[in-house]
Amino acid sequence: SLVGSEMCIRDRYDDVGCWKVPHLFYDEMRGAGIEARGFLKVRFPVFTSKVNYRNHRKIVVIDGKVAFTGGMNIALRYMKGFQWGIWRDTHIKIEGKAVYGLQTAFLTDWYVVDRTLITSSRYFPEMDSYGNALMQIVTSDPVGEWRDIMQGLLIAISSSRKYFYIQTPYLLPTEPILMALKTAALAGVDIRIMIPERADTRLTHLASLSYLDDMMRAGVKIYLYQKGFLHSKLIVSDDTLSTCLLYTSDAADE
């Protein structure tokens, strides 16, 4: 219990993604002193468009100094997998000033769900830089003027000279991304994409498979992960760039 404690725990969960979670679960969290808020609550999905505007971010920030992000949600299936295989995912730990970017993303989301604007410097403590790697936190949303993530991917693909490797659970690229990948492959860049042989949603997986022939004709190499469900979203390029994405190569994630 956090009652009477100086520690503050905030949980922002997606309301649609947690439809099957009983209300008692959140009541117990709040009773223990945890602030839990659902993102864009949907009670009657047939009568609202909010069901399409979901929050797919997985962010943990601890004391403003350490953060975790990646593909992992919090559920038993992420540990136990399926009867037909493991759940393969990637999550990363971040230390240093890049944590500020994830803290900003979380607090912005918190304002949406709680209407509390949090700007205290205690959430952005001064800290030294770690190592010499450059890191940028890029966020995107459906109402922004620019599709920052898609534009960043386009720049990364067009800038690659030797290789560009992708892991993604769902391969539903926008037309610009698809064209960029094929163009790079035709120009001699080693383009490799790994997707799961079997996915958690059949319809989405069939849609992903529909792109493969066209891409392979352009020279893109396709690999199927066979040990279970691949949920990891990774990009590695030219020994100079790596990303751990929440973006799933899906037009809905622009």
Predicted regions and their residues:
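PLD/PLD-like phosphodiesterase catalytic module centered on the HKD motif
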Residues: 10, 16-61, 160-165, 170-249
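A short, well-structured juxtamembrane/interface segment
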Residues: 148-152
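Signature of lipid phosphatidyltransferase scaffolds
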Residues: 52-137, 141, 241-249
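Structural alpha-helical scaffold elements that stabilize or flank donor/cofactor-binding regions
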Residues: 156-157
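Conserved small/polar residues in nucleotide/adenosyl-binding loops
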Residues: 2-9, 247-254
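Short, glycine/acidic-enriched loop or turn micro-motifs at the edges of active sites
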Residues: 17, 74, 253
